[in-house]
Amino acid sequence: MKSIKERVGFVVGEGYNERPIAAIEKIVAAEGDGIRQIWMNQGHLDTLTIFAAAATKTSAVRLGTAIVQTYPRHPLALAQQVLVLNDIAPGRLRLGIGPSHSSIIEGIFGLSHKKPLVHLREYVEVLRAVLWEGKVNHHGEFFNVVVNTPRNTARVPILVSALGEKAFQLAGEIADGALSWLCPVPYLLNTGLPALRKGAAMAGRSASPPPPLVAHVLVALTTDRHLALAAGHQYIEKNNISLPFYVNMFTKAGFPTTLGSAAPDILVDNLVISGNEDAVTVRLSELLASGLDELMVNLLPIKDTADEQFRLAHSIAEF
């Protein structure tokens, strides 16, 4: 069983104006502070390339993608990257993937975003076969792939993104974990976890522990709740309130929202943990005790970003 320290990861690279070298330096610093798990999303930078560079400067911290978008990257191309990274940092990569959103895949990449969960199921089947077995013979709706390279394998854990109930169920069926993002904790406990376990049971995986649910949580290191809520509003409304998958999830979680609107205060209050280091640590411990398997802690800067990142990282490392 993982220790509490191993169950709490730290998000880096959230700044879209951040240079790659800055993200690498944060990963190196986080390991130096005692952090066991790093998570990084796929913004305008390539996460796996950053991880490859960071892996040469670190020795133990686990590196998790949250997430790599599936539609723009063929599973064989992703497998090539993963094989290289696993050779540089054996056993340290946790590969989180997901279908992303129509406004991104169609609006930015110009690709079709049809049947995202069907596409994700096929993607994981091809990717796992190539990585874990070195061979695949797959003929489906989205992929026709025949490969046989048994000498190049890497049993890298494959986690998938999940917001809706069907996505959590799919994660339980096919993945090595589910990655949530901005999901209220009651929704995760009452909808996400049961669906994850249902999927695992349907796939005949009930003999072993179900795949872990990694819960994304927002943290503001301030005792001023108004500042914390303002930071939460800015983050949610800038990144997520205009995306239908999030609006649907918020509504099903009991926080009705509409596309492009301001997030309700009660939703932001539910999502943001605030206080000094001791108060935040207590709340994170409570979340782990509630039934969540792991936490992905995302700092909401208030005043001094560098200082707050340092303090939060130290708090996590001291679990």
Segments the model singles out, each with a brief description of its role:
Residues 1-319:
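Active-site-adjacent structural elements that line small-molecule/cofactor binding pockets in enzymes
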